[in-house]
């Protein structure tokens, strides 16, 4: 029922702009929005009847001619104002169809909208970029790459983009998927000989929202397939939004051709929320859940839980659950009692084993390989970084650190001096070390 009216209107606008002065276009025609194509009738909308009458009186023939030139087809043009019943009927019909389409393509969390996202200094660039993408898919930033640690709101923003487009745009096919799901579906398509079906699913959409892209590192076939999916969508002027726990340059074993494409658009980071933002997040959560939480309790939680939004909200839920179970009112003493285990665990003990595990996770290598005698660069270099961090973050002696790695103390000295010197010259390595320190310390 509905044609690809947005792309057709974009082509028509290019012709119109070449034939009108900027003043004429920006005064009247800029307000026109494509609504739908139904049985070769191109429905356009204007904000009010006055604008509609001006366009019908002065510019309708220009629009007809431009449509013919741009499409080599004779469309009937019908302009509706947004206060007309016919406009509302078509809009409602489109929204119903979009809702059906979007739910078959992917499931979006109804709680993850722009309205429920708390904006602060730590995330305002990412929020603004996501909103711009949602308002004008494939026109603002394409691709948009957002990165940050676990629980900071990346997935929330991606779902918010999907919800906003569903609500405000017509006819868009939106796909939200994690890179793990993408990989699993690819594996199944190969196993079941359904490659073409898989490609059609991911390449015949308008917006691709792919979460946790770092997990495709080391998966050569997945990277190959995603490379071609990316190219197909990008060349068709479709919006791509990617999230990761780190910027493209820091994703190990990511193919350079993918890395460069991820950097074509805008890269926006999300940092852990500052104190004021943590307070705002807690107040928003309390408001959403209809909870009456004293300000001093919110302040205590915001002071003690600094790592991410997920832990902040989890702490608040824990306090409420504790209150319900003990039949006690929520006050500062109850909050301290409810969170005593969480707060005490924040000062985690840093061991060499913990450092090894975090470094392995960060560089996507197996712990058994890390502790083996393998000397390949992708294992030896992270091992040297782990030795450096063990020297920096623990009070262990050099021989003891060496023993934890199955090496002697001279190897630890060499690793420490090497990484110390490289940090001074390599900004990327310096950022990686700082990120690893945060992860090891638990915030």
UniProtKB/Swiss-Prot annotation:
Q: Which domain of life is it from?
A: Bacteria
UniProt-listed Gene3D superfamilies: 1.10.1750.10, 1.10.8.60, 3.30.300.180, P-loop containing nucleotide triphosphate hydrolases
Q: Which InterPro entries match?
A: AAA+_ATPase (IPR003593), Chromosome_initiator_DnaA (IPR001957), Chromosome_initiator_DnaA-like (IPR020591), Chromosome_initiator_DnaA_CS (IPR018312), DnaA_C (IPR013159), DnaA_dom (IPR013317), DnaA_N_dom (IPR024633), DnaA_N_sf (IPR038454)
User: Which GO CC annotations does the UniProt entry carry?
Assistant: cytoplasm; plasma membrane
Q: Where in the cell does this protein reside?
A: Cytoplasm
Keyword field = ATP-binding, Cytoplasm, DNA replication, DNA-binding, Lipid-binding, Nucleotide-binding
Keyword check for rRNA-binding, yes or no.
no
Record GO terms (molecular function): ATP binding; ATP hydrolysis activity; DNA replication origin binding; lipid binding
- HAMAP family annotated for this entry? DnaA_bact (MF_00377)
How is this protein named in the record? Chromosomal replication initiator protein DnaA
This protein's species is Thermoanaerobacter pseudethanolicus (strain ATCC 33223 / 39E)
């Amino acid at each position: 029922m509905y044609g690809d009216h947005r792309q057709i209107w974009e082509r028509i606008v290019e012709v119109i702009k070449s034939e009108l002065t900027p003043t004429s276009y920006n005064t009247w025609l800029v307000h026109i929005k494509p609504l739908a194509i139904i049985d070769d009738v191109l429905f356009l909308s204007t904000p009010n009847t006055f604008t509609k009458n001006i366009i019908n009186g002065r510019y309708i023939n220009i629009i007809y001619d431009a449509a013919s030139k741009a499409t080599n087809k004779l469309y009937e043009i019908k302009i509706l104002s947004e206060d007309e019943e016919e406009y509302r009927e078509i809009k409602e019909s489109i929204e119903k169809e979009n809702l059906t389409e979007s739910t078959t393509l992917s499931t979006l969390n109804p709680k993850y909208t722009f309205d429920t996202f708390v904006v602060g200094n730590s995330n305002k660039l990412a929020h603004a970029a996501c909103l711009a993408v949602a308002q004008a898919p494939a026109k603002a930033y394409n691709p948009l790459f957002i990165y940050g640690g676990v629980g900071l709101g990346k997935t929330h923003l991606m779902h918010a983009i999907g919800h906003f487009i569903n609500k405000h745009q017509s006819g868009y096919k939106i796909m939200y998927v994690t890179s793990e799901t993408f990989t699993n579906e690819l594996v199944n398509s190969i196993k079941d000989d359904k490659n073409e079906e898989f490609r059609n699913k991911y390449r015949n959409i308008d917006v691709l929202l792919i979460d946790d892209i770092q997990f495709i590192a080391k998966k050569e076939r997945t990277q190959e397939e995603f490379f071609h999916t990316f190219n197909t969508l990008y060349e068709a002027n479709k919006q791509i939004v990617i999230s990761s726990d780190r910027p493209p340059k820091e994703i190990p074993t990511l193919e350079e051709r993918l890395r460069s494409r991820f950097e074509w658009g805008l890269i926006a980071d999300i940092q852990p929320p500052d104190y004021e933002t943590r307070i705002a997040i807690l107040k928003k959560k309390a408001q959403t859940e209809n909870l009456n939480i004293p300000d001093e309790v919110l302040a205590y939680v915001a002071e003690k839980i600094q790592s991410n939004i997920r832990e902040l909200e989890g702490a608040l839920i824990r306090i409420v659950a504790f209150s319900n179970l003990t039949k006690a009112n929520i006050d500062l003493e109850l909050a301290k009692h409810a969170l005593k285990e969480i707060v005490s665990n924040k000062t985690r003990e840093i061991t060499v084993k913990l450092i090894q595990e975090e470094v392995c996770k960060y560089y996507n290598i197996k712990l058994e390989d890390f502790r083996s005698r393998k000397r390949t660069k992708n294992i030896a270099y992270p091992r040297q970084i782990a030795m450096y961090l063990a020297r920096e973050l623990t009070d262990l002696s050099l021989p003891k650190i060496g023993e934890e790695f199955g090496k002697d103390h001279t190897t630890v000295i060499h690793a420490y001096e090497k990484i110390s010197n490289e940090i001074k010259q390599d900004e990327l390595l310096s950022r990686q070390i700082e990120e690893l320190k945060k992860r090891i310390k638990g915030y």
